[in-house]
Amino acid sequence: VMTSGNLSEEPIETDDALAWEHLDAAGIADALLGNDRAILSRYDDSVVRVVDGAVMPVRRARGYAPQPLSLPALDDTTPCVLACGPQQKATIALTREDADGHAACFVSQHIGDIENGATFDAWSAARTRLESLFDLAPAALACDMHPSYLSSQWAREQAREHNLPLIEVQHHHAHIASVMAEAIA
């Protein structure tokens, strides 16, 4: 059995020595297949389903992220919004207006559950990489309304520090909106 080199609820390891140390200490690996290529960005395997002959991503990661979802623009100016994601099964999304006047929504790879410092660091690295890759600086932040989520705490702090609009979204509303966005994209 091959695994991505991380413990459950931990981010994918980017260093062979650390991966071996963590997997061996947990007693779940007999060997490690490594490589001398640097891992610049943590991408897990994508999970898809085929429905009526069409591939439907369940978890966007390798091969699907950060491909944009094309959404209708709400008005003449679609600001760059950074959606910070939930605590569990987290991703990040950035929007911008594309050349056709639609909103392009760039969704990050699956990051995992943001419950510890290592996973929050992976979340932060994914956010920085997404902003850098598309040369985008958020004009507004969106986060879950839950007061204890690390991503929401970060968004609230950044909104205060940089005087950015903050859009707090109820968790179940975000689920519905994401399903609708994927359905029309």
Where in this protein do the model-derived segments appear?
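Acidic, glycine-enriched active-site microenvironments
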Residues: 1-185
